[in-house]
Amino acid sequence: MIADSSSWLKLTKKVRFGDTDAAGVMHFHQLLRWCHEAWEESLERYGLEAQAVFPGCRGQEQWPAIALPVVHCRADFLRPVHGGDQLSLHLTPQRLDPSSFEVHHRFLLEQQDVAHGWIRHVAISTETRRRSALPDAIERWLEASLIGRISEL
C-alpha cells in the first residue's frame, strides 16, 4: 500500500471530445462516471486489486462476499468544462458508519473549482443482500486516506 496519499487521492482527467455535448461542454452525466472511475483508479493506485472489490473480473475464481452498491450520488457544476481541458481531481473519502462511506470528488481547472461530485456506497452481503461491515480492503483505504488530514473531534 502506498503511504503518500497524494499519488492516489489526487488524479488528473483530460476532457475528451466524446465527453462533451453539441455545445462543446461536458455533458452532465459524465461527471458521475468520472467520479466512479476516479474511485476505481484511486483504489488501484493505492494497491488494491480490482478482484478484491468488484465482481466479474477476469480470472476471478470467486466474487467478493460483500458488494458496494451506490445508494446516493450528487453533482454540482460550477463552471463550464470544455473538450481538451486538463482537470485536477481531488478525492476525499469519508466513512459514514461501519457499513457505508462517501467519496467527495473535487474537479479543478487551473486551480479553480469547476465541479463537485459525491458518491455514497453501502456494504451489503452478496448472499443475504443485508447491510454488512465494509470489506477490510476498503477499511484500509479509508484509514490511509485520513493520514495527514485533520478531522473534527
Curated annotation (Swiss-Prot):
Q: What is its EC number?
A: 3.1.2.28
- Gene Ontology terms for molecular function: 1,4-dihydroxy-2-naphthoyl-CoA thioesterase activity; fatty acyl-CoA hydrolase activity
Q: Which GO terms describe its biological process?
A: phylloquinone biosynthetic process
- Give the matching SUPFAM superfamilies: Thioesterase/thiol ester dehydrase-isomerase
Pathway(s) of this molecule: Cofactor biosynthesis; phylloquinone biosynthesis; Quinol/quinone metabolism; 1,4-dihydroxy-2-naphthoate biosynthesis; 1,4-dihydroxy-2-naphthoate from chorismate: step 7/7
> Which one Pfam family would you cite for this protein?
4HBT_2
Keyword annotations for this protein? Hydrolase
Reactions the enzyme catalyzes: 1,4-dihydroxy-2-naphthoyl-CoA + H2O = 1,4-dihydroxy-2-naphthoate + CoA + H(+)
Hydrolase among keywords: yes
Which positions are catalytic residues? 21
Source domain of life: Bacteria
The record's listing under InterPro entries reads: 4-hydroxybenzoyl-CoA_TE, DHNA_CoA_hydrolase, HotDog_dom_sf
Family the entry assigns: Belongs to the 4-hydroxybenzoyl-CoA thioesterase family. DHNA-CoA hydrolase subfamily.
Q: What does this protein do?
A: Catalyzes the hydrolysis of 1,4-dihydroxy-2-naphthoyl-CoA (DHNA-CoA) to 1,4-dihydroxy-2-naphthoate (DHNA), a reaction involved in phylloquinone (vitamin K1) biosynthesis.
Q: What is this protein called?
A: 1,4-dihydroxy-2-naphthoyl-CoA hydrolase
